[in-house]
Amino acid sequence: MTTHNDDAAAALPQDENKIIAERRAKLSALREQGIAFPNDFRPQHKAADLHEKYDGKTREELEAEPVTVTLAGRMMLKREAGKKAAFATLQDASGAKADGRIQIYATLDLTGEAAMAALHHYDLGDILGVVGTLFKTKTDELTIKVTELRLLTKSLRPLPDKFHGLADQETKYRQRYVDLIMNEDTRRTFKARTAAISSIRRFMAENDFMEVETPMLHTIPGGAAAKPFVTHHNALDMEMFLRIAPELYLKRLVVGGFDRVFEINRNFRNEGVSIRHNPEFTMMEFYAAYTDYKWLMDFTEAVIRQAAIDAHGTATLTYGGRELDLAKPFHRLTIVGAINKYAPQYTNEQLHDAEFIKAELKKFGVKPHAHSGLGALQLALFEETAEAQLWEPTYIIDYPVEVSPLARASDTVAGITERFELFMVGREIANGFSELNDAEDQAARFQAQVAAKDAGDEEAMYYDADYIRALEYGMPPTGGCGIGIDRLMMIITDSPNIRDVLLFPHLRRED
């Protein structure tokens, strides 16, 4: 049956204060009756479950075996047929991938005079509790024939017009609660996010990984090349940092004998905001003793593929109107190999000429650090010429030592580490490597990072003496990887902006 919004939902901004005042008056009347916010209604059913179970029933079957239901939800639509009958649509949070909505039908005869009179004064956005029996309308829509109707929560603010929604994108992010009420796609996105993260946790548990929690406040920022947020611990009178990565703590646990550990939690980096970056973001990092970066690539591929299947129903996704197949084996290229493939104008000789690469980077507006060697320059050129073209899942492998201070050096190629980064749809999704477990080598690399920081590199790492001490007790050969959960969710849910997959993204203060 066709239903429509009422005037309150289509309110113009200048009418909003008037509508709020009218609703407050209704709430005042409820307070006087002592029934403003009851908390004794217990729903027993969900809209999506009722549709799944009874949509296939005929009108005759529902009449022959009446089904009594008790349900609560927010009233999203209402259509009155005089004083004797009214249809409304209630919305609850049910449904694996979307919302649950179900129509209700109230009549003077069945619902009662007092409840019907009250219904006429209910507004869209009000939360109602209903008891009734299921039936099907002439248009075969599953509907609850109401025998008991109660107002559970009075909504004071009018909902946006359903045809126009929230006024702009920033308002959607700032008032996510309204966006979730109005937008089925938003609800579907965050249900998919939950499904994907639950899938990852199951996959890790099935592969004998132990989930752990490590500190969010660090005395030394480490585990990644990034600028930290700085805070002060009053009781200890010391400077502390919101963590940029949990890596060094997780590897301490491997030293302690936990061979397989993982953590899904927040990291914080005091850097720019963009459609791909948020200062607070979710990462999964995992470490497995007696593995290397080749094992990690296979395992990471399997984790991501299963998460996509569990959240999306298939490993074949669509992003921005273009297909992305996660079912196929992921590609593997070196940094120079990727440049050769996606920027074939460069010769092999040019790609091994540091001065030539510096000149090319200048054309892109990139000024490398004075201490940058050939490997770092090649990586910078890759980022400018090839990275954005890596649509299909691709591992870029064998990163230079100078940009990989925590990775194990290659046994066969000087200056190269056993490290990879995973890219898809032109953005980095994961970073992993065979871990450096040589305490003396790690100490030397930390010293090189300190020198780089002294030379002006704000993202260079600090020297972590306690981590070196941990390595001196002996860490088994280990592989470790970090997966950017938010960016992965963007791809799985076909979301163009990282804010679309964060329930409450960071925004500037409201005026």
From Swiss-Prot:
Domain of life of the native organism: Bacteria
UniProt subcellular location: Cytoplasm
Entry's Gene Ontology BP terms: lysyl-tRNA aminoacylation
Positions annotated to bind Mg(2+) 1: E421, E428
Its EC number(s): 6.1.1.6
GO MF annotation: an example: tRNA binding
Record: residues binding Mg(2+) 2: E428
Gene3D superfamilies associated with the record: Bira Bifunctional Protein, Domain 2, Nucleic acid-binding proteins
Primary location group: cytoplasm
Recorded catalytic activity of this chain's protein: tRNA(Lys) + L-lysine + ATP = L-lysyl-tRNA(Lys) + AMP + diphosphate
Keywords recorded for this protein, A-Z: Aminoacyl-tRNA synthetase, ATP-binding, Cytoplasm, Ligase, Magnesium, Metal-binding, Nucleotide-binding, Protein biosynthesis
GO cellular component, one term: cytosol
Top-level class of the enzyme under EC nomenclature: ligase
Details of cofactor binding: Binds 3 Mg(2+) ions per subunit.
Entry cofactors: Mg(2+)
Family listed: Belongs to the class-II aminoacyl-tRNA synthetase family.
Subunit architecture: Homodimer.
Protein name: Lysine--tRNA ligase
Organism of this sequence: Janthinobacterium sp. (strain Marseille) (Minibacterium massiliensis)
